[in-house]
């Protein structure tokens, strides 16, 4: 059986020479070629330059000719280090190696100096070693993304041989082989046929698009070189799928569904990608209906042949609490208007389904706070409720992960923007009773945000598999927990009936308590103890370990400080840009206000002109009436004059004829 190590390794310069030996550098030209062939070009050149700086010193050799581009690139890398001290070059050499290959030390050759302290599994006596009346606690080293080994005095996380998972209710770190994925968080994880797939995620603010698979039988990592299906036969150069983070990865029909997620250039609506492990091909799933707006950090829950999507954060950083359902038979989206008080807008929460009827939402976060509330949606009546809970409720958290085993919902990780959640808890979904399964201490990957959690099987028993996360450092560790029967059944022994809407489906069964006790005792058989080490070497090892720990913490603090400085500088730049935009907008506002005032003055003048025209129009109407009256009077006068003229021109003949005009005048 392999003997896991629990040490931070030898001190410098021995650690540097061990790393150089692992890389294959011995100062010869052939060794440099080996390095270049094993690592990416930029990493290989930097490792070569640091090795030369540490072993030879500053570059004083003449520049190679342009006909030798490889040698010229190596010379430029070495020359760029200037007068860097040798010890600093050694430290950076090891740091870069650990960033590229975090598990290098465990895979190093046997000629690397052995560490001071060994940790052995399956000793004859499962009791801790006592020396001078003091009990030594177990020690576990968890390697982090940046390669530095963080030593944790915590027996809640132990090393396990890759072929055994025997400790119940305790997190263990199995040995894995193969190239581990780059450390990340906000990735997706799902299991198909005893293989855990890891897709996408976030690393140093960059979205990832790689796909890795872990064989859960052999614990071997491998990267999947995927293809992208073309939409038609005419398309010969399909565009690659955009890297993403904050998406959901669901196993469906021996395929993987990647739903939503944040991307560099987000689409307007939520997209669903499909990966077929048989053809190693990604393709876009064609859906119908009105899809949800593009988002990340949502929860996606498989309920029968449907996917239930809740919440998340859209591309404009607006938090959501809407509810959508995708029917996998018809591939049709449907937006649900539920009744009752829905959860507040949030992202990075966890969701589970109970009895194929009740959707449970726990935790999550907004821009300012994290939540610890539990909401239940009845999928038959589409009504939200907040039922009463039992036990000790978990602390507020976001970025946690959850899986269900029967009626039990296991919640792992998460954080509250201050620290990671150290307790792994379980909720019995029938009784709504919380209990703690395991607890970890220190800054370990399990107390991280954005980790993933899946369920696997080992010797017929369920095992929780956690991967990745971010707790100030990016992680790519695998941790396992095998819940005992007692932990999965202890909430069922409560006598109180289930409150709220879940009481109708409370069909919990009782089991033999004595067998639970036996299993619990069996789970405590495995202990990790320290080998017999003479006091002198132990004190020396402790001193070296303390110094290494202090140096590691110093480096972490320096890295955190540099990161904070970069963030502060970025925020200042963004603030300056915002102030500049604000100034421009204010100038535009003043200009618009001036234009508005001019338009208002012009409108006022127009109103005055209109009033004057109206007054003149009224005067014209009066004059028109007077004119018409005068015209009528004139016409009457002219008519009278004509009549008088006619009467005056009759003469003698008119008098002799009897003046017929007079008759006409006298006639009515």
UniProtKB/Swiss-Prot annotation:
UniProt GO MF annotations: fatty-acyl-CoA binding
Binding site for an acyl-CoA: 33, 48-52, 74
Gene Ontology CC: cytoplasm; cytosol
Keywords: Coiled coil, Cytoplasm, Kelch repeat, Lipid-binding, Phosphoprotein, Repeat, Transport
Compartment annotation: Cytoplasm
Chain positions found as Phosphoserine: 515, 520
Tissue: Mostly expressed in roots, stems, and leaves, and, to a lower extent, in flowers and siliques.
PROSITE patterns associated with the record: ACB_2
Signal peptide region: none
Annotated region (Disordered), positions in chain: 639-668
Subunit structure and binding partners: Interacts with RAP2-3/EBP, an ethylene-responsive element binding protein.
Name of protein: Acyl-CoA-binding domain-containing protein 4
Organism: Arabidopsis thaliana
């Amino acid at each position: 059986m392999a003997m896991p190590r629990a040490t931070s390794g030898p001190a410098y310069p021995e650690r540097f020479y061990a790393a150089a030996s692992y890389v294959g550098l011995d100062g010869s030209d052939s060794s440099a070629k080996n390095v270049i062939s094993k690592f990416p070009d930029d990493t290989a050149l930097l490792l070569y330059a640091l090795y030369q700086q540490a072993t030879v010193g500053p570059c004083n050799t003449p520049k190679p000719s342009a006909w030798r581009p490889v040698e010229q690139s190596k010379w430029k890398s070495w020359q760029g280090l200037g007068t860097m001290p040798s010890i600093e070059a050694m430290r950076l050499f090891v740091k870069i190696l650990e960033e590229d290959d975090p598990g290098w030390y465990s895979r190093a050759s046997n000629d690397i100096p052995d560490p001071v302290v060994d940790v052995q599994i399956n000793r004859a006596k499962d009791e801790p070693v006592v020396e001078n009346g003091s009990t030594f606690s177990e020690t576990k080293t968890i390697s982090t993304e940046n390669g530095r080994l963080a030593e944790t005095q915590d027996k809640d996380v132990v090393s396990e041989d890759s072929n055994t998972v025997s400790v119940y209710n305790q997190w263990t770190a199995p040995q894995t082989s193969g190239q581990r994925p780059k450390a990340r968080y906000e990735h997706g994880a799902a299991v198909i046929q005893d293989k855990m797939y890891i897709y996408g995620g976030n690393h140093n603010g960059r979205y990832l698009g790689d796909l890795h698979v872990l064989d859960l039988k052999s614990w071997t990592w491998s990267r999947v070189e995927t293809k992208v299906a073309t939409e038609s036969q005419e398309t010969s150069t399909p565009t690659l799928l955009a890297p993403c983070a904050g998406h959901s990865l669901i196993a469906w029909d021996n395929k993987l569904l990647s739903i939503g997620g944040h991307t560099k250039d987000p689409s307007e609506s939520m997209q669903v990608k499909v990966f077929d492990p048989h053809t190693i091909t990604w393709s876009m799933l064609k859906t119908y209906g009105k899809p949800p707006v593009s988002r990340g950090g949502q929860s996606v829950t498989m309920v029968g042949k449907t996917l239930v999507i809740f919440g998340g954060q859209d591309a404009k950083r607006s938090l959501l609490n809407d509810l959508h359902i995708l029917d996998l038979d018809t591939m049709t989206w449907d937006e649900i208007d539920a009744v009752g008080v829905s959860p507040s807008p949030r992202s990075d929460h966890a969701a589970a389904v109970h009895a194929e009827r009740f959707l449970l939402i726990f935790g999550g976060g907004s821009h300012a706070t994290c939540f610890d509330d539990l909401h239940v949606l009845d999928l038959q009546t589409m009504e939200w409720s907040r039922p009463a809970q039992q036990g000790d409720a978990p602390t507020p958290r976001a970025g946690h992960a959850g899986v269900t085993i029967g009626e039990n919902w296991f919640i792992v990780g998460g954080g509250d923007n201050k620290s990671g959640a150290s307790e792994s808890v379980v909720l019995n979904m029938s009784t709504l009773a919380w209990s703690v399964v395991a607890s970890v201490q220190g800054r370990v990957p399990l107390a991280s945000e954005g980790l993933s959690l899946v369920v696997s099987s080992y010797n017929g028993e369920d095992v929780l598999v956690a991967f990745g996360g971010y707790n100030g450092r990016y992680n790519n560790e695998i941790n396992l927990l095998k819940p005992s029967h007692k932990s999965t059944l202890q909430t069922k022994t409560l006598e109180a009936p289930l409150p709220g809407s879940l009481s109708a489906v409370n069909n919990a069964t009782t089991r033999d308590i004595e067998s639970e006790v036996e299993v619990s005792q069996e789970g405590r058989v495995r202990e990790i103890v320290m080998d017999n080490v003479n006091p002198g070497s132990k004190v020396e090892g402790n001193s070296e370990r303390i110094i290494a720990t202090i140096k590691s913490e110093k480096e972490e603090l320096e890295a955190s400080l540099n990161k904070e400085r970069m963030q502060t500088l970025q925020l200042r730049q963004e603030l300056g840009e915002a102030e500049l935009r604000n100034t421009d907008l204010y100038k535009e506002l003043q200009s618009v206000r001036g234009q508005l005032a001019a338009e208002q003055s012009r409108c006022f003048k127009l109103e005055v002109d209109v009033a004057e025209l109206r007054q003149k129009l009224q005067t014209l109407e009066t004059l028109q009436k007077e004119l018409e009256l005068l015209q009528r009077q004139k016409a009457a006068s002219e008519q009278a004059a004509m009549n008088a003229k006619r009467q005056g021109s009759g003469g003698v003949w008119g008098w002799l004829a009897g003046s017929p005009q007079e008759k006409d005048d006298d006639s009515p």
